[in-house]
Amino acid sequence: MKKISQVLNWLSSLKIAILLLLVIAVSCAAGTLIPQQESNQFYYDNFNKNPFLGIINAKILLLFEFDHVYTSFWFLFLLIWLGLALSVCSFRRQLPILKSALNWIDYKSPSQIAKLSVAQTIVTNNCAKSLEKIKLNLKKQGWNVKETDGRIAARQGVIGRLGPILIHLGMILLMIGATYGSLNGKTIEKFLAPGRSIDLLNNNEEKGLTIELQKFQIERDPQGRAEQYKSIVNVIEPNGNNQSKEISVNYPLRYKGLTLYQADWSLAAITIKIDNSPKLQIPIKPISELGEQVWGTIIPTNKDGKNQILLTVDSELGPVNIYDNDGTLLTKLIINKEEKVKGALIKIINIIPSSGLLLKHDPGVPFVYLSFAIILIGGSLSIISTKKIWVLHENEKSMIYIGGLSNRNLSGLSKELPNLISFLET
C-alpha cells in the first residue's frame, strides 16, 4: 500500500503535470513545423539534405513517427499519462479540498481565532446584540452563515473550489476528444474543377455525401497575386437532399460533422483549338522545374505527333506561353486570340482553374468544444476567493473575537474585516 501511495503521489505531482504539458507542447510545435502524413520519399527528399533542427534527418524522423505526430504511439501515451495524472490529482487533492471547504469548522476558543491569517478583537457593551448585528451584516453581504451556541461561522465563495476540478475535467475531456479525433478522424485533400464532384463513403463503406463544385473564383490584386479564392459547393445526400454554399479561405462549410475548407487553388486544364479541330480540353500539370506555380503540358501540332510544343501558364487569366522543343519561347497567347505556331493555327478558349478543397471529419470536435467550455467555466470560478470568518465572544470580558482566512486575496479580506467591526461600532 505504501508503494501504491508513493506512485499515486508521484502521478499527482504538479511538477510531473507541468513537465508533461511542456513535452506535449513541444511535440505539438514539432507537428506544426514538420509536414504531416506525407509519403516516406517526401521526408527523404526534404530532410536528408536539410535535417530538422540540424540533427533530425528523415530516418530519425520516420523512426520516431514525427511524420504523424498526433497519432503516434508516444504522443497518445503522453496524453493518456497526463489524463491519468490529472485524474489522480483531482481525486487525491482537489476533491478533498472541496470537501474540506464544504465542511463547517467550529472554533470554540479565542486562541484558535488568534492563529488565523486575519484576526481582530473588539470590546462591546452587549455581546449578544453585537453578534446579531454581525450575523445580519454578513448575510446582507452574501455570506453563508451558521450559528452554534452563540458562535458564528460564515463562508463565501466556496464555489471557487470547484474551479480547479472543472479545469482538470475539461483538460481530460480535451485529451479524450483529441485522441478520439486523431484515431477516428479522416482528412481528404482534393482538387476539383467546376462541374466535377467527389463521392464520400460512410462508415459502412457505402456511398454517403457527394461534394460537387459548382463554381470557383480567384480574386487577385492589381499585381496579379491571388488574394482570396471562393468556391460554391453543393453537398448532396444519398436521398437527394442538398445544400449549396459559398466557401472561402477562413470561411468553411460545416455539415453534419463534416468541415469543408477552401484550402488552395490550382489550374486543371486548357481549352484549345488547333486549326479546324473541335474544342479540346487538355489537362495540365504542375511543372516545378519552371517555377512554384507553373502548369503546363506538351501537345503535337500535327497528326503524326512529332511536331510538339510546350504550353505553360501561371494564371487562369493567361497568357499561355508556347515553347519549342529546345526551350525557345515562340509566343504568348492570350485567351480568345489565335496565332499561327509552327504551321498550326492555335486558339486558347479558356483556362480552367481547380479548387483545392480540404475535407475533415473529426468526431472528437464536440468533446473539444465541450472541454473548452468547461475549462472556461472552471477558470472563471477559480478566480473567486474562498473566504471564511469565525466570530466568538466572552461575556465576562465583554470581548468579541473575529478572524478569517482566504485561499487568495488575503489583503481583500483584511480590508473587509475592519468594515464589519466599524459597522458594529457605529
Curated annotation (Swiss-Prot):
Main location (coarse class):
membrane
Which species is this record about? Prochlorococcus marinus (strain NATL2A)
Q: Which PANTHER family match?
A: CYTOCHROME C BIOGENESIS PROTEIN CCS1, CHLOROPLASTIC
Q: Which family does it belong to?
A: Belongs to the Ccs1/CcsB family.
- What is the official name of this protein in its record? Cytochrome c biogenesis protein CcsB
Q: What does the entry give for GO biological process?
A: cytochrome complex assembly
Q: Which UniProt keywords apply?
A: Cytochrome c-type biogenesis, Membrane, Thylakoid, Transmembrane, Transmembrane helix
Q: Which InterPro entries match?
A: Cyt_c_bgen_Ccs1/CcsB/ResB, ResB-like_domain
What does the record say about its membrane topology? Multi-pass membrane protein
* UniProt subunit comment: May interact with CcsA.
* Functional note: Required during biogenesis of c-type cytochromes (cytochrome c6 and cytochrome f) at the step of heme attachment.
Localization recorded for this chain is:
Cellular thylakoid membrane
